[in-house]
Amino acid sequence: MTHPRAALVAGAAILALAACASRGPVDPDAPRDVHQSLAPHALHEDCMKLAPGDRLDYRFTSSAPVAFNVHYHAGNAVVMPIAREAITADSGIFQPALAEDYCLMWEAGPEPTALDYRVAVRRRAP
């Protein structure tokens, strides 16, 4: 027996997972501008490998408050060198102390959110 509500929930879950997908490696020579729509309480991540000496330049605006962080996984722990709550804009330069796969992550609040961000990786000189 199929329930319309179950189909709706499954569809929303698929959309939320699609919003979480990373867009692949950032080209160090090309900043990337992204426009992303987020459903209520949806997440979006953009991940990349960074090493000491690299620099991650980022900035974003959102149409509604979001939670934002830059994080990596260390075993079962999630380490967040940058974490902000309920903001509609932020920018900064993140310089990692460790070589890790880092993710920028945004989480929408209770309303749909339009997210615009720019990210650029500057690799350390050889």
Regions found by a protein language model. Name each.
Residues 1-9:
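Bacterial N-terminal signal peptides that target proteins for export
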Residues 17-19:
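C-terminal motif of bacterial Sec signal peptides marking the signal peptidase cleavage site
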